[in-house]
Design a protein with these regions (language model features):
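Acidic/glycine-enriched connector segments
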Residues: 1-157
C-alpha cells in the first residue's frame, strides 16, 4: 500500500456549480499539496467533482511525474487482468477495498470511508444546499422517500 502521509483523496457531489472557479481552485490546492509532499491521489467515480480533480492531477502529472493516480472502485472486487486494464489505461493503480464490492447500495459510502482511512488529507466539495437524489424505499409495505448525500456522510465520517 502507500504511505498515508503522502496520500490525498477527493470526495464531492455528483454535480457541481461554478465549474470554472472550482477548476482553478482544485488546481491550486492540488499543486500546493504536491509541493508539501503529497504524491498519491485517490479518486472515486461517478461525480463531476472527481472528474475535475482527475483532470487537474493529470495535467499536473506532466510537471510532477512522481504523481500516482489511484482509482478506488466500488465494484468488480475479483476483476481479472483484462478488466483491470480498462481502468489502468487512465489510472496508475486501481483498488477495490475489502468488503466494498459486496456492500450493495452502501458501496459508495464504504468506498469513501476506505479512501478517507487511507489518506492523510481529504479534499471535499460539500455544498450544504446540495439536493441529493431522492430514493424510494419500501419497508413493511410502507413507501417512504429518503434523501441521503453520500458526500455528507463521508464529510461527517472524516
Amino acid at each position: 500500500m502507500y504511505d498515508k502521509q503522502e496520500v490525498c483523496c477527493f470526495i464531492g457531489h455528483r454535480r457541481v456549480g461554478e465549474k470554472e472557479t472550482l477548476k482553478l481552485r482544485i488546481y491550486s490546492v492540488t499543486e500546493k499539496l504536491i509541493n508539501s509532499g503529497m504524491h498519491v491521489f485517490l479518486f472515486g467515480d461517478h461525480s463531476e467533482f472527481n472528474d475535475m480533480c482527475y483532470e487537474a492531477v493529470t495535467e499536473l502529472k506532466s510537471f510532477y511525474p512522481q504523481i500516482v493516480r489511484v482509482l478506488y472502485r466500488k465494484d468488480y472486487p475479483k476483476a481479472d487482468a483484462y478488466t483491470l486494464q480498462f481502468y489502468l489505461d487512465e489510472f496508475d493503480d486501481c483498488i477495490c477495498p475489502d468488503g466494498v464490492g459486496y456492500a450493495g447500495v452502501a458501496a459508495y459510502v464504504e468506498r469513501n470511508r476506505a479512501m478517507i482511512a487511507q489518506s492523510s488529507v481529504c479534499v471535499f466539495y460539500y455544498d450544504t444546499d446540495y439536493r441529493a437524489i431522492s430514493r424510494r424505499y419500501v419497508k413493511n409495505r410502507i413507501i417512504t422517500r429518503e434523501t441521503k448525500s453520500g458526500t455528507k456522510l463521508a464529510y461527517d465520517f472524516a
